[in-house]
Amino acid sequence: RLIGRERGYHGVGFGGISVGGMVKNRMYFGSMLNGVDHLRHTHNLKLNAFSKGEPEHGAELADDLERLVQLHDASTIAAVIVEPIAGSTGALPPPKGYLKRLRELCTKHDILLIFDEVVTAFGRMGKATGSEFFGVTPDIISCAKGITNATIPMGATIVQDFIYESMMENADAPIELFHGYTYSGHPVACAAALATLDI
């Protein structure tokens, strides 16, 4: 089972729409991925209308994960995916302490935490990643756009060592991660990414 968040955006592919919380993105499609649920969103204009930076109210909304754990059982939840800053729903920063609390709960229940950093990684927030900016370490980071300075399409997935080691130890094929696309690892995209990182 995967847990997304209401108002979350993770692209318009089948999986991204399923875990994303954008109702209008799902309304033109039939059934989505099974086993997906959503945390409540953190946008509260009434309480946070004049907040500067991270909103003061709403960190407790991370505890909505406890409701989903009670509903589904933690052993059935593989991961929670959120954007450090909700991009397509208004560039909304999380409430103070929200991401740290989400990290604590994922650790407590042995659930992976994924940050979708397509928008926030590679200097967009003055740090290498949004996770570094907020001082929260997820288990997986998905990133794109800024990795090549948006000059050529490329994306990447960054994982904690324990995930990488698990993939290497349990590979049942000559390819460690049997997943990819026709243009994955394109040399020009990789060169653009390396040049961007050098800058």
Positions of PLM-derived features:
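Conserved N-terminal phosphate-binding loop of PLP-dependent enzymes in the Aspartate aminotransferase
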Residues: 1-199
